[in-house]
C-alpha cells in the first residue's frame, strides 16, 4: 500500500502465490525460476519481478503477472473467516515494488480479485435466500457507476431496484441460480448492495473485508 493505493499483493510462500507455471515462463530455465522462487521466500519479491530484473522476461508481462497472481492470492481472503489486517509502516516501499504502478481505485482492484472466486469456494457465503432482495447501499449506486463491469455484471447490477428478489433477477436474466449467487457475492463483498429479507424491515449490519481494508489504509468509508 502507498498513500491508500494498492501496489501489489505478495507472499513469502511462492507455492501459495503461484502454484502453476504461467506460459510466459515457458522459455525460462527451470533453475532460474527455482532461484526466483527461493528469493521470494526470503524477501517476498514476486518471482516475476526477479525474472524481469534479470531480463529473462519482459517487464510489461511481468507486471501483468504480478497483478494477476496478487489478486488471485487476495481472493482467498474474501471467503475466509476471521480475517484481520496488520500493517507495518515503512518510510518507503521495498525496492522491488518501486517500478509497479499503484492502483488508485480500491474497488476496481478488489473486484478483479473477487472474479477469481468460483462458486464451490463460497461455502456458507452461497447460502443466500433466493427470496432475499438486493438493494443498493447508501453510496452503492454511485460507486457502481465507476466500476469497469463485465457485460454480465452490468446486466446483473441493472436489476437492483429494491424490490426484485435474487430468484427473480436470475429468472429475468435467464441465469443459473448458482451463477446469480456468485455474481451477487461480488457486489455484497464490495458493499455495493446488501440483501434484505422479504419478511423483515431490519437493515442488516455488514462488516466486510473491504470495509476493514479501507479503514486500515485510510480510505473513506
Explain the meaning of each model-derived region.
Residues 1-221:
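Acidic, Ser/Thr/Pro-enriched low-complexity segments and adjacent helix/loop capping patches
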